[in-house]
Amino acid sequence: MKKTVIAILALAALVSCQSLKEEWQPVLSPAKEPAAFVPYTESSLPGFTGKFTSIEDLKAKYKSKPWEVTGNIWIKGQVTTTDKTGNIYREIYIQDETGGIDLKLGKSSLYSEYALGQTLYVYCDGLTLGAYNGMPQLGWEADQTSTNEYETSYIDLQAIIDQHVFKGPYGDPVEPELISEAELKASIAAGYNGKLWGKLVTVMGAKYGNQIFALFYPNPSLPHKSGNPENRVFLSDNGTWGVNTWSCSKAGYISYLEKGVWDTAEVGSGATRYGRIDTVTPASAGLTGKTLDSFHPYENSTYKEIMIKNASANYISHYFKFGSTDVQVRTSGYAKFADVELDPQLISGAKTADITGIMTIYSGAAQFTLVDEPSVSVKLN
């Protein structure tokens, strides 16, 4: 089926030229609210035989490698996310009574097509079930390009989306599930099979952990793979690095660099370290061949200067403690609230927070994505 669809839509794919990059680059043009339409019902779904697979059972079919779904497999769930704020982009989460899943619809302004609480019916035949650092995802075939290594890719073409995603009736927004630390620990221990991943949840009484995590790629021309330490700068294991905003837009990223609060950050990863970003250059790092050429004409500029030149919005993760368990709240640099400062009382530890969002897993750790502005998703106690 997939090969047939690709052949039919090859010309459309060339025209659309939509990127498969994992980094979020929202098109922040105004979009209309969901328009009136005639919703699908179970009786009107094309080819539906009357039986749904639960989201939990679908995810259980993943066995440590991408699986192209075959057969008349349908799931249904209610929409739990919106891309209005820019923090979730080119994907949508749906949830049934058994769990949630990340549906990789490669479009912007999805909130103009899919409303919170709306039921979506998903025909899974021909789609690919995979994981990104342990997080279940349902999308198109694996993206194994020179710069990316992902088990699924975005469903970019509307014609393909229309064959797989059917809009059902509107409904009330899903109420977040109030979870305990024990439930979160159990999901972490279960890895990919954790019951909380992809679900809309609330954790209560989270304390700020005074630590962040960020990973920057100074040269957009080089791969973003772990095997390219010359193109990696980590901010981790050293407090907050002067970051007091939820993330950083392009302007915020430049501002932090220019203030010098990241000067001691090193280029490299693991055991391979090239030196501080404010002193080392691609040439002095000993880079050679095409790798060095990719920095031309800035091979003798410091990495800090190169990072400012190639600046873009970037993710930041802030650590919180939920009991004794670490939870990262990860925010896109393209979110409308990227440069909003965390409340000083939260940072100081004077107050805790009840946080609502989509719970995910990343490399064995719990990670939160806010689905609304912090003023809505983060309530101080």
Regions found by a protein language model. Give the residues of each.
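OB-fold nucleic-acid-binding modules
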Residues: 18-89, 93-119, 123-381
